[in-house]
């Protein structure tokens, strides 16, 4: 089991939590981004830099994902793709993507894209909060308690 991170838009506080979890649980955490990422020295943490381009990092994450892995992403289509491969998907706010909710999330995303294309201001997500970080930490700990190798 490994943790793959869609790192381009992942909040720094979440990356720090993942770095601590990697060392504590001795699991591989791989950050994938189209820019250079500084990571702490650890045999459990690595960064993969991909070329710039639309969805290049997402494609690499899908390629690397295996059944049982955990993918951290806010990207709904990426979450759908890794769920199809049997991986788990968690967003940086601690919300799970699942077979039960992914179609609705994709539909909502498509509708919001259509509204934006029509010139309607749909706003954006709320700023990342301390509560979001706590929710993420709780969900990550629960997942690792069930799935990390012992």
UniProtKB/Swiss-Prot annotation:
Transmembrane intervals: none
UniProt-listed Pfam families: DUF188
Matching PANTHER family: UPF0178 PROTEIN YAII
HAMAP family per UniProt: UPF0178 (MF_00489)
Family: Belongs to the UPF0178 family.
Protein's recorded name: UPF0178 protein Bcen2424_1660
């Amino acid at each position: 089991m490994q943790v793959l991170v869609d790192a381009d838009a992942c909040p720094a506080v979440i990356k720090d939590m993942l770095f601590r979890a990697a060392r504590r649980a001795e699991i591989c955490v791989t950050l994938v981004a189209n820019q250079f990422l500084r990571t702490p020295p650890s045999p459990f943490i690595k960064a993969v830099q991909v070329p710039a381009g639309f969805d290049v990092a997402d494609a690499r994450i899908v390629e690397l994902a295996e059944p049982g892995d955990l993918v951290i992403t806010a990207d709904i289509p990426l979450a759908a793709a890794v769920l199809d491969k049997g991986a788990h998907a968690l967003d940086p706010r601690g919300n799970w993507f699942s077979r039960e909710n992914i179609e609705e999330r994709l539909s909502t995303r498509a509708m919001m894209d259509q509204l934006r294309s029509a010139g309607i201001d749909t706003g954006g997500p709320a700023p990342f909060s301390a509560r979001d970080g706590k929710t993420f930490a709780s969900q990550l700990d629960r997942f690792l308690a069930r799935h990390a190798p012992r």
